[in-house]
From Swiss-Prot:
CDD domains: RWD_Spc24
Record note on quaternary structure: Component of the NDC80 complex, which is composed of ndc80, cdca1, spbc24 and spbc25. The NDC80 complex interacts with mis12 and zwint.
GO cellular component: Ndc80 complex; nucleus
Protein name: Kinetochore protein Spc24
Length: 199
């Protein structure tokens, strides 16, 4: 469009020169001058419009460039945030794996404790049975042996010694036998010899 207007302006200028050279009428000259003025006004308007278009284009380019910068910054922030989330996820997965391992160990310990508890309960039942059955029976036998033999045993002496006091006769008789020096048969016969045969 601008090229066409310049071409028209050149044509008008040529016509003006022709009129001036050919001594044409003043009306034709005025017409040509009016046409030239109109062309100049049109050129000025076109220049103003072109300048405004250039300014608008530069403003649009500036906005697009700023938007690109903002988009890149947002992208970098998002990428950084994504990496942070990924690291946190990895750490939590590792922590979760560690917790699962700890839970398995604790479950194993719990099972072992349950087994131990059952064993302790069995031992407690056996101990209760001993308390209610074996111990009274042993006490009864000990009293029976004491009543029959009339011997008070010394349970605090050396294990290799058999010590006590026999109260079966008129006089209390101490007993002290070294089991390392005498056979079991001898010791048994000796103790039986202390018992009274009078019933």
């Amino acid at each position: 469009m601008l090229c066409e207007q310049i071409s028209e302006y050149v044509d008008v200028s040529r016509e003006i020169v022709k009129v001036m050279v050919s001594d044409s009428a003043a009306g034709a000259l005025k017409k040509s001058l009016d046409r030239q003025e109109a062309m100049i006004d049109s050129l000025l308007d076109t220049e103003v419009q072109a300048s405004q278009l250039i300014r608008d284009l530069m403003a649009v380019e500036e906005k697009v460039a700023q938007k690109l910068l903002d988009t890149e910054e947002t992208k970098q922030k998002s990428s950084s945030k994504l990496q942070k989330i990924d690291r946190e996820l990895q750490e939590r997965m590792e922590k979760n794996a560690s917790l699962e391992s700890s839970i398995k160990f604790l479950q194993k310990d719990l099972e072992e404790l349950k087994v131990m508890e059952e064993e302790i309960a069995d031992m407690q039942r056996e101990a209760d049975e001993d308390t209610t059955t074996v111990i009274p029976s042993a006490v009864y036998l000990a009293k029976l042996f004491h009543n029959v033999t009339k011997i008070d045993w010394d349970y605090n002496c050396d294990p290799s010694l058999i010590k006590g006091i026999h109260y079966g006769g008129d006089i209390a008789q101490p007993i002290s036998i070294d089991s390392n020096q005498h056979s079991k048969i001898f010791i048994c016969n000796y103790l039986w010899s202390l018992l009274s045969t009078d019933w």
